[in-house]
Design a protein with these regions (language model features):
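Short linear motifs embedded in intrinsically disordered, charge-biased segments
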Residues: 1-183
Length: 183
């Protein structure tokens, strides 16, 4: 998965946008923000609902996001402006918050699916094959239950029941605060 993130960050579309279009002074800040919202974020986060986020992936995504936002704001790293201040100035929520909210939203969809749907069956499946040596990889189910516990305060044993209640789940996701120290 990390190679996929690295590939997306270094994609030709991103580099071309970052180097040529976004740095043009002729474009308004509003137009550059539109490019950020309509092209950059979807290319970077395609399929993000199923990602298991590690600290390294979080760091890489945040660095790519802030690199783009620095250019949108017309700033360089030498200006030493905090990420939080740049985001507030541009009116943009943290990309990691968007990813976490979408991942938890996908869990809500899974919880409300009727029995027999393929995504729900894959979610419930326990692999029977033998694992390779070393630390086991984190499964999406374990990652998402830990995320819900840390960020929403929903215990893992109650997670599916709470996620089935659409109104409650949506209100919890709307109240999801940014991670401390993410700015």
């Amino acid at each position: 998965m990390e190679r996929e993130i690295d590939r997306r960050i270094g994609a030709a579309v991103m580099r071309a946008l970052n180097r040529s279009i976004v740095v043009k002074r002729e474009l308004s800040r509003k137009a550059r923000l539109s490019i950020y919202r309509l092209i950059y974020i979807p290319v970077l986060t395609y399929g993000h609902q199923r990602w298991v986020m590690t600290e390294r992936m979080r760091s890489r995504i945040q660095a790519a996001e802030m690199s783009f936002l620095h250019r949108v704001a017309g700033l360089s790293l030498r200006d030493r402006v905090r990420s939080l201040d740049i985001r507030e100035g541009l009116g943009v929520e943290p990309l990691l918050l968007h990813i976490e909210r979408s991942q938890l939203g996908w869990l809500g969809h899974l919880a409300r699916m009727p029995s027999g749907c393929l995504p729900l069956e894959v979610f419930r499946t326990c692999p029977t094959r033998r694992w390779p040596r070393g630390r086991p990889r984190t499964r999406w189910r374990d990652y998402i239950s830990r995320l819900a516990w840390e960020r929403l305060g929903v215990p893992p044993e109650d997670l599916m029941e709470v996620a089935r209640e659409r109104a409650v789940w949506v209100s919890l996701l709307k109240l999801l605060p940014p991670r401390p120290g993410s700015g």
